[in-house]
Swiss-Prot record:
Source species taxonomy: Bacteria, Bacillati, Actinomycetota, Actinomycetes, Mycobacteriales
Recorded GO MF terms: aromatic-amino-acid transaminase activity; histidinol-phosphate transaminase activity; pyridoxal phosphate binding
Residue positions, PTM N6-(pyridoxal phosphate)lysine: K215
Protein name (database record): Aromatic amino acid aminotransferase
Subunit annotation: Homodimer.
Length: 351
C-alpha cells in the first residue's frame, strides 16, 4: 500500500517548462542570450569559495541594496527563490480552502497550479485583445476574493495594461484584497507604458510588486527575485518562507547585478530593437500579433498552435505553445531570430 496523498492532487497537472532539445535553437523560455558580466562572474566565483556555509537567511546585505535600488526601507523588501516562490508565499498568506484568487487568463501558468495547491479556487477572467480586462476583473470580485494577480507585461501574451487604468483599478479594489503586480518583464517596457508600481505600493498597503533577476539581469539559473510591499505583508511572507532557498551564490550575483544595473539594462535596448524587427517581419509575413512590451512575442494561432510548435521543432527551432491558444516566441540573438523567421515565413499552416 502506498502512502496516502491529498486526493485533489490527482487531477492537478505539473508545471511544464519550455523544452530543451540538444542542437536546436531554444526560444521557448524567455531567457536572455547574454551571459553574466565579468563583474558578476567574479562575484559568483568568489561566493563559491564559501558554499560550505549556509547562506544569509535574512538576506541582510541584499535587502539593503535592493531597498536603496527601489528607494524603500529594507523592511519593505522580501527575497525569494525567484519571484515564482514569492507568488506561492503570497497565496499561502492570503488564501485557503473556500477562498478565491483572481487573475486574467491566459496568463502565467503557475498561478492556477499554486492556487489549487493551497486549496483555494482560481478565478480566470478572459483577456480582451490579449490584455488583462481590468473592468471585468473588478466585476469578478466576490466576498471570497483574497488575492488578485496582474501580470504586467503579461506572460505569455506580451501586453501591458494602461498605467492610468492600473492605478484606477487598484483604487477600486477593496483594501482588504491583496493586489500583486507581477513585473518579471518590466525592464522591457517602452513607449511610456511602464506604471508607477512602486508609487502604488506607497499609496496602498494592499499592493505588492514582484520583480526578478531571471530576465533582464540574466540570472535565470540562479533563481532569485524580490517583493516590495507593506512591512506587515513582508513579515507575513517570512512565516511561510522555506529557509535558505536563495543561495549565497545567487545573493552575491544579485548584488553584483545591482552594481552593474545600468550596463545590464542597456542590453534590454538591443532586445527591444530585435523585438521591433521580428514583430514587423512577422506581420509582413501575414501573422497577427499584439504589440509586445516584453522580451517575447505572442502568436495567437488559435487551433494551430500545437502544429506550429511541432513543425518548428522539426526545423530545429523550439518555441512554446499554450494549448491551442497560441505560441510564445522569445526574442533571442539576431541569427536565432533569423532562423525562426525563416521557418515562420515558410510555414505551411500560414497559407
Amino acid at each position: 500500500m502506498s502512502a496516502r496523498l491529498r486526493p485533489e492532487l490527482a487531477d492537478l497537472p505539473a508545471y511544464a517548462p519550455g523544452k530543451t532539445v540538444p542542437g536546436a535553437i531554444k526560444i521557448a523560455s524567455n531567457e536572455t542570450v547574454h551571459g553574466p558580466l565579468p563583474s558578476v562572474r567574479a562575484a559568483i566565483e568568489k561566493a563559491i569559495d564559501g558554499i560550505n556555509r549556509y547562506p544569509d537567511n535574512g538576506y541582510v546585505e541584499l535587502r539593503e541594496r535592493l531597498a536603496k535600488h527601489v528607494n524603500f526601507a529594507p523592511e519593505y523588501i522580501s527575497v525569494g527563490c525567484g519571484s515564482v516562490s514569492l507568488c506561492q508565499q503570497l497565496i499561502q498568506i492570503t488564501s485557503t480552502v473556500g477562498d478565491e484568487v483572481l487573475f486574467g487568463w491566459r496568463s502565467f501558468e503557475i498561478y492556477p497550479l499554486q492556487v489549487r495547491t493551497a486549496g483555494a479556487t482560481p478565478v480566470q477572467v478572459p483577456l480582451t485583445d490579449h490584455t488583462f480586462d481590468l473592468d471585468a476583473m473588478l466585476a469578478a470580485i466576490t466576498d471570497r476574493t483574497r488575492l488578485i494577480f496582474v501580470c504586467n507585461p503579461n506572460n505569455p501574451t506580451s501586453t501591458v495594461v494602461d498605467p492610468d487604468a492600473l492605478a484606477r483599478f487598484v483604487e477600486a479594489v477593496p483594501p482588504h484584497i491583496m493586489v500583486v503586480v507581477d513585473e518579471a518583464y518590466v525592464e522591457y517596457i517602452r513607449d511610456g507604458l511602464a506604471p508607477d508600481s512602486f508609487g502604488l505600493v506607497r499609496a496602498h498597503s494592499n499592493v505588492v510588486v514582484l520583480r526578478t533577476f531571471s530576465k533582464a539581469y540574466g540570472l535565470a539559473g540562479l533563481r532569485i527575485g524580490y517583493a516590495v510591499a507593506d512591512p506587515d505583508i513582508i513579515a507575513a511572507l517570512s512565516k511561510v518562507y522555506v529557509p535558505f532557498t536563495a543561495t549565497s551564490v545567487s545573493q552575491a550575483a544579485a548584488i553584483a547585478c545591482l552594481d552593474a544595473a545600468d550596463e545590464l539594462l542597456e542590453r534590454t535596448d538591443a532586445v527591444v530593437a530585435e523585438r521591433t524587427r521580428v514583430s514587423a517581419a512577422l506581420r509582413e509575413a501575414g501573422y497577427d500579433l499584439p504589440p509586445s512590451q516584453a522580451n517575447f512575442v505572442w502568436l495567437p494561432l488559435v487551433g494551430r498552435a500545437q502544429q506550429f510548435a511541432a513543425d518548428a521543432a522539426n526545423s530545429r527551432v523550439i518555441v512554446r505553445p499554450y494549448g491551442e491558444d497560441g505560441v510564445r516566441v522569445t526574442i533571442a540573438a539576431p541569427h536565432e531570430n533569423d532562423a525562426f523567421l525563416g521557418f515562420a515565413r515558410g510555414w505551411d499552416g500560414l497559407r
